[in-house]
């Protein structure tokens, strides 16, 4: 199972051909538009066709004739052809909206939407970059639900920034266990999680592009699960109490008897983890933190040049409401962007995540998702320590359209020892469409390592479609 959302762009988005506006000024934070953000569409009031021209006529009755309103298709094309123009000096909030039908084997068919707005707190200030707000949602046939909002307020010629975001997630997913070996073995237990998340941060410039700030967050995760009963079922087959079935179950029985290539005792990794650690399925975590960052990027959500470095330390004390424990978390992000030839950018990303103490089961560092190690189910590989790196080549090919290709690698360790042989790879390609000024909608397809080929459900190479707004990093 791979937790990703594949979204197919609507044909209306692909019909546009307006030139992108110039880049915005540097903003002082790594926080992109939410990594899961894209689209449902709302067309504003109809306007006369932009190519329509009024000429003076001798017949005065012609002057009184009503102007023909453009059709729906023409209005959609006109709307998106103007959507990447910076209108933040004209409007209080420059809203855009777009649809996102999607499909994934993990979550089924779905409808997603993105409502995104750019605005300036002072419309007479051309130095400070625009602030932004976004609301994203996705609903699928397999009952996956995601609702998320974020807002970034930029002040005082980019010297201060206040950011906050929240999300609600209902996800019928899977748990593979903790540690590299657990992820490699591929035993997954169905696990339905309900998550509520809130984040807030504030940073200010000390010297030039060097910023320091404070942060806070609240996480709640509730889990529902049940045992597969596979140990008892296999034993009944072995004791001839029931006949051996055909299909996948029969194959699993043969694998169990043939050299223990299948172990039914590992079929319920979440139940085993809870029993072994005494952890609680439902966990509440709050944190306070400090961070420092250096940022020379030209645009935060679609950089073409510059450097971004951020170190953050978070503390989760038990007295602040954390479930039965106190632990710390440390993250490091390093991004570098270099213009190559016309329309080409080489982007590099390095990310490290480590915990001190023992976190709740859902707070371990997780590999995979929509930004790093694309192609892996997020959380299949999780542990106390994680490191990931990737190179991505981005090439604009025609006006607002572009393509990318990337290659990367990563590791998790802590429960298991660090070994170079445990390194996982990620590679893929994608399409880009400039939806708003310097903001891309991206459609990626990523691949990873093969799963456990002994298991009938895990023999293919890990892969995933991804669709969201803004670049991965």
Give the predicted meaning of each segment.
Residues 38-163, 242-304, 383-384, 395-397, ...:
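Outer-membrane beta-barrel initiation region
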Residues 93-95, 107-111, 129-131, 143-147, ...:
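Residues that define the transmembrane beta-barrel architecture of outer-membrane proteins
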Residues 101, 113-115, 133-139, 149, ...:
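Transmembrane beta-barrel strands of outer-membrane/channel proteins
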Residues 112-113, 126-128, 147-150, 174-182, ...:
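Outer-membrane beta-barrel translocator domains and adjoining extracellular loop/strand segments
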Residues 116-118, 152-154, 201-205, 215, ...:
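Transmembrane beta-barrel domains of outer membrane proteins
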Residues 118-122, 136-142, 169-173, 221-223, ...:
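Sequence/structural signature of outer-membrane beta-barrel proteins
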Residues 278, 288-293, 297-398, 406-409, ...:
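C-terminal outer-membrane beta-barrel translocator/porin domains of Gram-negative envelope proteins
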Residues 370, 431-435, 439, 443, ...:
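Outer-membrane beta-barrel "beta-signal"
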